[in-house]
Amino acid sequence: MELTFLGTNAGVPSKDRNVTSMVLDLQNKQKSLWMFDCGEATQHQILHSHVKLSRINKIFITHLHGDHIFGLPGLLCSRSMGGTENPLTIYGPTGIKAFIETALTLSQSYLTYPLDIIEIEQDGFLFEEEGIRASCGALSHPVPCFGYRLEEDNKPGKLNADKLETENIPRGPWYKLLKQGKTVTLPDGRIIDGKDYLSTEIKGRCIVIFGDTQPTPNAVKLAENADVIVHEATFKHDMADKANSRGHSSTIQAAELAKKANAKRLIITHISSRYSPKETPELLAECHTIFDNTQIASDFETFKL
């Protein structure tokens, strides 16, 4: 998987960073792209990236503040003008449906593809498909806001070809079934269990993407044992009180969350305009005092997960 940040600024765009949006490339057979938030000018950012609108089949909205949704109507229409008929599903808090339908109705816009809008009212399971189980958890912000947890299925271990050869099991179409851990009957009548020829299964990855939030116990629960957490760090820690009063987090608070959740990796984003690119190393340094494996995202940066 790869995660590309299209916008990493908080609140309003700056000369160096656009407002929030990121795209997860599942790198699967379906070539699916999942977008998280869609701030103003996200589609313009896409023009400068490798992201293809037609491949985006899910959009997850964390909350209804403008810097996270004002890019949606234009993006939906541009996706349609590209001629795609691929279905699109949008998940978001209550109100996202009215926002989208009002924008499309008043502008008399027509979409060439099926659009399904699913409103979220509480924590819990969302769906399981494409080898991923998705769930959400409520955060602490002035408006309803959610974080999303994606848990990848475990993958079968590698097939032990040497053991198969030692036991005189010839290569054939049954290898594919053995790799899946299934039981097969060989041409000579022998029945073998694929699980006996596989190494330990490969644990699936867990990725948690937060919306805006101040520290809250539910965030720790949502991020528990995650391989990667994407979390806002609007201000340096000397402005933690100001951050919290607006429903946001500081650098150190984001790092503390990752540590409490026993996460493996933290990527911070949603940086205030008061910090120039030259100052971002200072934000990262603060995180490193608490959680060493922290990175800071910039626009158009892609992280391998």
Swiss-Prot record:
Keywords: Endonuclease, Exonuclease, Hydrolase, Metal-binding, Nuclease, tRNA processing, Zinc. The keyword Nuclease applies. GO terms for molecular function: 3'-tRNA processing endoribonuclease activity; exonuclease activity; zinc ion binding. Its EC number is 3.1.-.-. InterPro entries: Metallo-B-lactamas, RibonucZ/Hydroxyglut_hydro, RNase_Z/BN. Binds 2 Zn(2+) ions. Zn(2+) 1 binds at residues 63, 65, 141, 212. Its cofactor is Zn(2+). Zn(2+) 2 binds at residues 67-68, 212, 270. It is an enzyme of class 3 (hydrolase). Homodimer. NCBIfam families: PRK00055.1-1 (NF000800), PRK00055.1-3 (NF000801), RNase_Z (TIGR02651). Zinc phosphodiesterase, which has both exoribonuclease and endoribonuclease activities. Belongs to the RNase Z family. RNase BN subfamily. This is Ribonuclease BN.
